[in-house]
Amino acid sequence: MIQPISFGYSSVLKSEWRKGKLPSVVKDVYGQILEDVTIEHLIPKSLGGKSNICNYALANKLTNEARSNKPLMEFTTKENLIAWFLQFVDVKTEKFDGNEYIKNATKYLAKNGIKLDVWG
C-alpha cells in the first residue's frame, strides 16, 4: 500500500502541545487562541529561514496560510511575540525546555533583525 506523502512540518513543539504537555501555551504567535494548530516558520524559508525549532512557532492554520511567506512583522507585533515567548518561561518536559526555546528563538530572530526583550 502506498503511503501518502506529507509536506507538513512537525516538531517537538507541536507534538508536546498536542499531547497537552504545554498547558500554559494557549495563544499563537499572532495573539490568537490556539485551535487548528500548524507549525509556523518565524522567518519564512523563502526569506532564508531554517527548518529548526529556533525558527518555529505555533499558529492557527488559517493565519499561517494567510501570511504565507510574508515577513513576520507584517502579521504580528513585538508585544504578541513577547507574549508568545512568555508562555514558555520555566516550561520543561522530557523532550522540551521552554527557557532554551526562548533563548534560541529570540537569538535567531535578533540575527534576522527582530530584537525582543522577553526577560524585561
PLM feature segments, named:
Residues 60:
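Zinc-coordinating Cys/His ligand positions in small cysteine/histidine-rich zinc-finger domains
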Residues 43-57, 65-107:
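Polybasic, low-complexity binding patches
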Residues 3-56:
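Histidine-centered nuclease catalytic patch
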Residues 13, 80-84, 115:
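Acidic, low-complexity intrinsically disordered regions
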Residues 1-12, 99-102, 113, 117-120:
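A boundary/linker detector
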